[in-house]
């Protein structure tokens, strides 16, 4: 296999105008890989450390130190290593960093290299990235969990739930699912506009109208689905990212004007899934409420997918604890939460081995990088969350999945309802 010849890096900006790290990897056979690192708005306290410069430049969010770490330290460490030995490469970087949360070199530095090396190795092998990572069995296209209405930390809409998503589960192909999602999205804009509400967009391309409750937001989406000509729950299901750690203060959930316990929030969710065809709820409880998660999973885990984002932070150790305690039943996969590809692979493998579902995910601060689209297919996630069908940094991932579906041809399978076997008819 080709050897790593040179690693370079630079500071670029993401979709929110904040700096991030982009890495170039050149192999000795001329193969080249480039990757850019995403960044989140609502971040879990247990995530790998994103190294920022501080100071006045870019209001403290510069990443020149992370870039320097790639160019001066990581490049020297990985020079001459075989590019297809991803596990060794990631381990060498973790050893070089020497901290549990990658705070010395920065997870943004390490991840940029990890992804760029994989891209270069795929090019050297003359394979698309999804095939290089996933092998011959990578053929399942994920259900797009499209965030078409934004709240919480992603918008100034007044509603506490961070993301209201649609899942086109009734489609036959990914391309059809994307069309369904786009048609509902455009219809939602008209529904919102006709009610005299704002059609401004949040960080992830979803609309951010001023609504006063979760149910009011869901009602807008249900109306849009029906007016677009689709059946709610049959053609298109609903999903939520509550991001509850964002409104958890002083031991209580400050939700929709009240202060609630974990037990009371469980009743809120139980009522919602009875009233609406919701197949997935992400981060329903605070990220360290293990007891609450176990109780919630026992209560409604057979009726709805309960996804750990801030709860698991794509970390195999936290996921293993969740499996042991029967807390949640699905893993959200964000490569920058853990900081290397192989640790991401390990988390997804652990989830699937124990009957947990997985959902590949973007971050609110994104770039044109499409790595997660390939990984969703390579790791057989069956679900992907990468925003609304709007804003080029979101659409880039959907368009890459269209290309992958085209490459696969007759071998392509769209996950559809099978992504939620317990929760759909």
Swiss-Prot record:
Its main location: cytoplasm. GO terms for molecular function: magnesium ion binding; phosphopyruvate hydratase activity. Gene3D superfamilies: Enolase-like C-terminal domain, Enolase-like, N-terminal domain. It comes from the Bacteria. It is an enzyme of class 4 (lyase). Its cofactor is Mg(2+). Keywords: Cytoplasm, Glycolysis, Lyase, Magnesium, Metal-binding, Secreted. Pathway: Carbohydrate degradation; glycolysis; pyruvate from D-glyceraldehyde 3-phosphate: step 4/5. The active site is at residues 204, 334. Mg(2+) binds at residues 241, 282, 309. It catalyses: (2R)-2-phosphoglycerate = phosphoenolpyruvate + H2O. The keyword Metal-binding applies. It is found in: Cytoplasm; Secreted; Cell surface. SMART domains: Enolase_C (SM01192), Enolase_N (SM01193). The keyword Membrane does not apply. GO terms for cellular component: cell surface; extracellular region; phosphopyruvate hydratase complex. (2R)-2-phosphoglycerate binds at residues 162, 334, 363-364, 385. Its EC number is 4.2.1.11. Binds a second Mg(2+) ion via substrate during catalysis. Belongs to the enolase family. PANTHER family: ENOLASE. Catalyzes the reversible conversion of 2-phosphoglycerate (2-PG) into phosphoenolpyruvate (PEP). It is essential for the degradation of carbohydrates via glycolysis. This is Enolase.
